[in-house]
Amino acid sequence: KVISVGNITVGGSGKTPLVIYVTNLLKNSGYKVGVLSRGYGRKSRGYKLVSKGDEILTSVEECGDEIYHTSIECKVAAAVSENRVKGAKKLIEESEINFIVLDDAFQHRWILRDADLVIIDQSFVNTKDFFTHNLLPAGDLRERFESLKRSDAIILNRKFLEKEEINQEMKKYFEEKKIYTAYYKAISFVDVMRKIEYNLDDFKGQESLVVSGIADPQSFLNILNKVHVNTQNKLIFRDHKNYTLKEVQQIR
């Protein structure tokens, strides 16, 4: 069985959290799941086995930060390969899996899949000048919205918007599609090194240094503002950044 998780826009749609959610859902349902990614931003080429589930077998530099994070969160077999067909075959050979989640594969046509899931940021859909968006490299679109007809289900990520809303002009692209809604909700703060969990109120109003290194930093800042964390002092870095020693020292 194969499920593809992808999008039609550049960055910030919530694809990696959806990959983690789908993978854990399948794993908890009894499937032996493997995740295959191209390994965006990695410093290696070819096929790399990232994890067999119980341990990470490579460095974040060799596989890329997204699949590295997914492997830690899901504890399933995972691999990277720019050739998805060869990568899928090798991942099946090297691990006892019966289900593959293809990360960021909506534009890839060479592997037959049982379901194509596409996640879209609702704010992008509702932008008034939406139809002026251009295809890469001139704009934000990987492909036209007409391509959604290939999808089996669409996940509308409303993030912090109060309700699901689709622009009237856009509704024709969503007809006869299964539409699901995703949103963000802060639950707690976690010290990942010491594995200590803190209540949201523990940081309420305190002076903080906020560090972000994701495609859509505003969504992260919105989370903190919603739980009354002071975000005045912040360091905003680009997505997939390799941090220098000077930057790490600055954060500390």
Task: Annotate the PLM regions.
Residues 27, 72, 225:
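Anion (oxyanion) recognition and catalysis
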Residues 40-42, 46-174:
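Phosphate/Mg2+-binding loops and adjacent switch elements
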